[in-house]
């Protein structure tokens, strides 16, 4: 079991990726291969005590930047760190990939090198959000900004299977994100998707609104990558702003500071619950392999947790189980009501 880390991807690469890998290897004994400019990686590793750690270096001469086209990872920069990481996975030299780089490029490289699971047209980035009652899975949160109804239907099926067999939800409630609960709301994309999902035999509860993501009434929320990414970034910004507002209010008076001392544990638990770094990264569902996509601004904690999650994902055989379930259940779902034909028509 070995995790390949795209050490050159992300806003703070390679220092954060290297340190995150070192922490994961030291605390959890996870074998890791850092992919990127080996000279720079050796310099970064020299800042840490790596004695006894199973950390390998694999050279990649190119980097796909955050502003590069996603296709660069496939066509122009064939020796990019993210593509090379997926090549290691394909050849068996690694069992999972972790990247905080360009999410579009990561998805493109994963699709090109590993191919898609049977029955999936487009993979989706799935993100877990904390809620009042547990957790909600939202997909897609950035992989596909332009979608057709068939893609959202596939996202719904992947999310439902993931929630059941990974998150442990016995009967996941699936909702389609819209601007209101009434069937008349939404746009052409959501209305067509809504009519199709009503004919599929899982617990589809119809349209849900943005607030429903956090109140715990739904387990899987489906949307296109444009909307999902806005939701993701808005949530991160709101959590950060609320934290700063609370800090400012606490500083206003002695009584506020005293109250904080008695409530410190509650504040700490709240901060931990809304901290994206606790979740590490988001699994890329729909490709024939395990890949975790991290926030571009990921810190050491986030990279470490993404590596740990990827390791656990592989160790439990989650992707194999997901592939098996998708192959049988996707075929069954898609045959109900001639879903694919109705969309194509």
UniProtKB/Swiss-Prot annotation:
* Keywords (A to Z) from UniProt: Cytoplasm, Lipid biosynthesis, Lipid metabolism, Phospholipid biosynthesis, Phospholipid metabolism, Transferase
- GO terms of molecular function: phosphate:acyl-[acyl carrier protein] acyltransferase activity
The UniProt entry, under Pfam families, shows: FA_synthesis (PF02504)
Q: Which domain of life is it from?
A: Bacteria
Intracellular or extracellular location(s): Cytoplasm
Query: Which one GO biological process term can you cite for this protein?
Result: fatty acid biosynthetic process
Which reaction is this enzyme known to catalyze?
A: a fatty acyl-[ACP] + phosphate = an acyl phosphate + holo-[ACP]
InterPro entries, per this entry?
Answer: FA_synthesis, Phospholipid_synth_PlsX-like
Q: What is its main location?
A: cytoplasm
One GO cellular component term noted in the UniProt record for this chain: cytoplasm
Q: What pathway annotation does it carry?
A: Lipid metabolism; phospholipid metabolism
Its EC number(s): 2.3.1.274
Q: How does it assemble?
A: Homodimer. Probably interacts with PlsY.
| Family the UniProt entry places it in | Belongs to the PlsX family.
Instruction: Write out the function statement from the record.
Output: Catalyzes the reversible formation of acyl-phosphate (acyl-PO(4)) from acyl-[acyl-carrier-protein] (acyl-ACP). This enzyme utilizes acyl-ACP as fatty acyl donor, but not acyl-CoA.
Q: What is this protein called?
A: Phosphate acyltransferase
Naturally occurring in which organism (per UniProt): Geobacter metallireducens (strain ATCC 53774 / DSM 7210 / GS-15)
Lineage of the native species? Bacteria, Pseudomonadati, Thermodesulfobacteriota, Desulfuromonadia, Geobacterales
UniProt gene name? plsX
């Amino acid at each position: 079991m070995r995790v390949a880390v795209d050490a050159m991807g992300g806003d703070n690469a390679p220092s954060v990726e290297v340190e995150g890998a070192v922490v994961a290897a030291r605390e959890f004994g996870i074998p890791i291969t850092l992919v990127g400019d080996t000279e720079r990686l050796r310099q970064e590793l020299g800042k840490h005590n790596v004695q006894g750690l199973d950390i390998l270096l694999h050279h990649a001469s190119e980097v796909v930047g955050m502003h590069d086209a996603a296709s660069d990872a496939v066509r122009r920069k064939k020796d990019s760190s993210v593509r090379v990481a997926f090549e290691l996975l394909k050849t068996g030299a690694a069992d999972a990939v972790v990247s905080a780089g360009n999410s579009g490029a990561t998805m493109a490289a994963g699709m090109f090198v590993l191919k898609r699971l049977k029955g999936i047209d487009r993979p989706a980035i799935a993100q877990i959000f904390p809620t009042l009652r547990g957790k909600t899975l939202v997909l897609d949160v950035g992989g596909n900004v332009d979608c057709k109804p068939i893609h959202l239907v596939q996202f719904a099926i992947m999310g439902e299977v993931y929630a059941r067999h990974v998150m442990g939800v016995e009967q996941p409630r699936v909702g389609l994100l819209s601007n209101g609960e009434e069937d008349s709301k939404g746009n052409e994309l959501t209305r067509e998707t809504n009519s199709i999902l009503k004919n599929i035999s899982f617990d589809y509860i119809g349209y849900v609104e943005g607030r429903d993501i956090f109140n715990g009434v739904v387990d899987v929320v489906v949307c296109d990558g444009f909307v999902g990414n806005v939701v993701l970034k808005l949530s991160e910004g709101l959590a950060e702003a609320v934290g700063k507002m609370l800090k400012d209010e606490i500083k206003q008076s002695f009584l506020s500071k005293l109250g904080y001392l008695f409530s410190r544990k509650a504040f700490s638990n709240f901060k931990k619950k809304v901290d994206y770094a606790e979740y590490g990264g988001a699994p890329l569902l729909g490709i024939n392999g395990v890949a975790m996509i991290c926030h571009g601004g990921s810190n050491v904690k986030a990279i470490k947790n993404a590596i740990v999650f990827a390791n656990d994902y592989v160790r439990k055989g989650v992707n194999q189980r997901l592939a098996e379930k998708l192959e049988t259940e996707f075929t069954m779902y898609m045959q109900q009501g001639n879903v694919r034909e109705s969309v194509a028509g």
